[in-house]
Amino acid sequence: MNKDVQQAPDFTEDRHLDPLVKEFLKGINAGKPVESLSKEAARQVLSDAQSSVQVDLSGIVESEQTITENGLSVPLTVVRPQGSAGSPPCFVFIHGGGWILGDYPTHRRLVRDLVVASGFPAVFIRYTPSPEAKYPQALDEIYAAVRWIARNGARIGVDGSRMALAGNSVGGNMAIATALRAKREQGP
């Protein structure tokens, strides 16, 4: 190990940051490193961090549906721009969180912002995280949901023949893996 490795700077004192961001960072940095926590404690840290900030959730309509495809039941949350009609193209959102953390409540604000900014509905896939799911269960659930949306999008008010895949962090990884699988299997 390199003895010259330096400690990361304390960004909580960065004069360029908004005071609310500094306060948020102080709270995050006050706890133990997330990798040292149990999965339950780590999930709670993320949940608490997201719920500690009041956010604008206006401009959207949410609905939930559990679909079954290829023998897998997968819960979906459909997030539409308020006042939208018909079956427009959509984007499928796959959340990050190191395969272990995250869910719709921790990503609700991000999905809302993407829906409002783009004007298109999102379909949030509530895949089973690790360690409850063993590889490749989460990817199988995501691909099953994408196949179902492609075939049945009108049932949830979207055009499943015109969808994009998106995700943050590990969700981006799984979006790419899903696109590659669709190409390999000549699927949606």
Predicted ranges, named:
Residues A144-P188:
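Primarily recognizes the serine-hydrolase "nucleophile elbow" in alpha/beta-hydrolase
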Residues S87-G97:
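Short beta-strand element of the alpha/beta-hydrolase
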Residues S63, V123, A166:
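Conserved Rossmann-like nucleotide-binding pocket used by diverse enzymes
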Residues R80-G83:
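Short, low-complexity Ser/Thr-rich regulatory SLiMs
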Residues D103-Y104, L110, S118, V123-R162:
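Catalytic nucleophile-loop/oxyanion-hole region of alpha/beta-hydrolase
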Residues H95-G97, Y127, P131, G167, ...:
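Conserved phosphate-binding and hydrolysis motifs of nucleotide-dependent enzymes
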Residues M1-V78:
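A glycine/proline-hinged amphipathic helix-loop "lid/cap" segment
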